Amino acid sequence: MAKIAFDELRFVVADDNAHMRRIVRTLLRAFGCREIYEAEDGASGLEAVEAYSPDILISDITMPIFDGIELTRMIRNPEGCRHPFLPIIILSAYSEKKHVIAARDAGASEFLCKPVSATALYRRIQNVIANPRDFIRTKTYFGPDRRRYVNPNYSGVERRIGDGSENIVDPDQVHIEA
């Protein structure tokens, strides 16, 4: 695990729940962070991002005025925000796939389910710092590239050989002989 200089990082934590902001702030302080700015809704979160130029935004998904998904979209709009490359970690009590996909499609860098643990938060922060994803722009999206790395040397039974769905292997149909 790479060591992170938390004392050199600036965070904005946007969450409408004061108790959750306090938990995240306490964890960040325990990691060594000195600069933490808080916001109680999406609008003040965007203002804090513009005012403090953080290194990372940690945002709840459900907040008043506009939620974490809308906040992420606003930040990822290069014409609307000065920090479109800002790493964004979405926190949510909603762990259903549709919420994870919505956050990903809005341009979130990471998704973390509540209740949050110190280890999980540290790993997400470490990932956005040590292993940042390249950004891509399409007609409908600007944000971290969510495509997975394809290892050309992998030759397992689930290896895709082309772009067509006919090459997708159904694990239930694979018979491996010993």
Residue ranges and their predicted role:
Residues E38-I56:
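Acidic, metal-coordinating helix/loop segments flanking the phosphotransfer/catalytic sites
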Residues M63:
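Receiver (REC) domain active-site loop signature in two-component systems and cognate sites
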Residues A130-A178:
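CheY-like receiver
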